[in-house]
Amino acid sequence: MHWTVFLLRGIVGFLWSGWVQVGYAKGGLGDNHVHSSFIYRRLRNHERREIQREILSILGLPHRPRPFSPGKQASSAPLFMLDLYNAMASEDNPEEYLVRVSLAGEAKETRKGYPASPNGYAHRLHLPPRTPLTTQSPPLASLHDTNFLNDADMVMSFVNLVERDKDFSHQRRHYKEFRFDLTQIPHGEAVTAAEFRIYKDKGNHRFENETIKISIYQIIKEYTNRDADLFLLDTRKTQALDVGWLVFDITVTSNHWVINPQNNLGLQLCAETGDGRSINVKSAGLVGRHGPQSKQPFMVAFFKASEVLLRSVRAASKRKNQNRNKSNSHQDPSRMPSAGDYNTSEQKQACKKHELYVSFRDLGWQDWIIAPEGYAAFYCDGECSFPLNAHMNATNHAIVQTLVHLMFPDHVPKPCCAPTKLNAISVLYFDDSSNVILKKYRNMVVRSCGCH
């Protein structure tokens, strides 16, 4: 019942730009083809602010992120994360998500066969299964990376913070340094995998017959008068003329940095020939910060929330719903639309799934939410009256409750129309530091309804 009440309140947020959109579905409980009629009402400012706070709370964000203005060319980290988003989103709702990216790096959803509504909203919320469009050819994200998604509920990419090369000793004159800020990671998230990625173009023709060894080190301790102590993390061997992304495993180091952020002194990278001669990383073909934006080095980490964190989130959500229900009982009926506003006794139908589309773009969040532009949340509404037929997905308890309600209508209420199956959505967004975050939010989309 609480979920139904929440969704009915959420009707106010159908059109975040300032309009309410209410749809009545036609069809059975399992019918994904939703046809709608619409009622519009302009939102008051305090309603819009409340909706913004609620959505940010669901996303686990204390405030609206305000990233730096992106450049004209899409950079490597967001492109990589878009590939992961496609993989994760197609797994969550394979018929819902399809992402393409423009040269400016702006993510857009496409939905085949969606006639536009007066405010740009789709009336038809079903797509036949299709392979998601990718941001790169070939994709930046490999099968190995997408496999990490099975154990992760959040992925973050980090940009290199080093703006000027250090002067190292003659022995390490060709070393390059990289630093990443991991302090923005939410509390309770554990690193399941982490990678450092750097792009390799063709190396200098002098080394065309050479095998080049590229090594990545963790900086253990820094000194003012000599080179830092280094710990070897990973090594890759490649031919000078090879082209593509080199991936280094830095999982253990990333976990150490998350637990002990004061020890995050960064990474150093070097390139050597087969006989051990240190060479300039640019001569080896490695692309640094002066290269194209789409080939910039970056770090990516996969996270999974601890069970303690999940329990605390569920407890906080439960308390919040209780407080919301208390406030609703004292609320002016004219302030928020209720089920009775849209479902008169003549219109009331059996329990079924109805349209509810949430648009991030119309909320004005397109500068920090990369994808999706919005999502079809749906909600459940309708009567659970005797007899409960097979199409109502009624539980045995609901059937018994219906019979008892017939005998004692003043003491036992009817069963409630509620979701019987919920799906997750994936959201890709920038944080305040312009790091890109991909996070899975569970129980966000109603797949089917029934009587409970």
From Swiss-Prot:
Keywords: Chondrogenesis, Cleavage on pair of basic residues, Cytokine, Developmental protein, Differentiation, Disulfide bond, Glycoprotein, Growth factor, Osteogenesis, Secreted, Signal
Any one annotated GO CC term: vesicle
Gene disruption: observed consequences: Deletion mutant mice show a number of skeletal defects, including small ears, several reduced vertebral processes, and a reduced number of ribs and sesamoid bones. BMP5/7-deficient mice lack midbrain dopaminergic neurons due to reduced neurogenesis in the midbrain dopaminergic progenitor domain.
Source species, domain of life: Eukaryota
Family affiliation: Belongs to the TGF-beta family.
Protein name: Bone morphogenetic protein 5
Propeptide: 26-314
GO molecular function: BMP receptor binding; cytokine activity; growth factor activity
Disulfide feature: C351-C417, C380-C449, C384-C451
